């Protein structure tokens, strides 16, 4: 058995983190694909060579829907990347498995709802609530990491 297999066999938390983080990375890929599809549908290309290939330089332009997709993707990068670090470290602190699952599922749910609300142009309160909820879980993990580190200095 590999060393990762041994770690996962002895921990209920790491597999939960790996599941949620992998789903979030797949969600980020989905947003990237959606962005590309919106670019094609709206004929709004970022590079002149792409525009020339698709009809002419007039299509090297911005579009509000493409910009919305890009903002959603950027927001993912600003929030999911820190979660990947925090959740990984938190997994090795020996947290209560149920509490860890709750943290990970709150982040996963918050980020999925945020993306759906953002791309679907839903009520901004839904998007903001989902953002805050996911950030709260990350902040909680960060505080627990700092607490553990401070006790070992």
UniProtKB/Swiss-Prot annotation:
EC number in record: 5.3.99.3, 1.11.1.-, 2.5.1.18
Residue numbers on the Cytoplasmic membrane side: 43-61, 121-124
Pfam family membership, one: MAPEG
Single GO term (MF): glutathione transferase activity
Task performed by this protein: Terminal enzyme of the cyclooxygenase (COX)-2-mediated prostaglandin E2 (PGE2) biosynthetic pathway. Catalyzes the glutathione-dependent oxidoreduction of prostaglandin endoperoxide H2 (PGH2) to prostaglandin E2 (PGE2) in response to inflammatory stimuli. Plays a key role in inflammation response, fever and pain. Also catalyzes the oxidoreduction of endocannabinoids into prostaglandin glycerol esters and PGG2 into 15-hydroperoxy-PGE2.
Topology within the bilayer: Multi-pass membrane protein
Record's keyword annotation contains Membrane: yes
Pathway it works in: Lipid metabolism; prostaglandin biosynthesis
Gene of this entry: Ptges
UniProt record, GO biological process: cell population proliferation; cellular response to resveratrol; chronic inflammatory response; negative regulation of cell population proliferation; positive regulation of prostaglandin secretion; prostaglandin biosynthetic process; prostaglandin metabolic process; regulation of fever generation
InterPro entries: MAPEG-like_dom_sf (IPR023352), Membr-assoc_MAPEG (IPR001129), MGST1-like (IPR040162)
Record localization: Membrane; Cytoplasm, Perinuclear region
Stated name of the protein: Prostaglandin E synthase
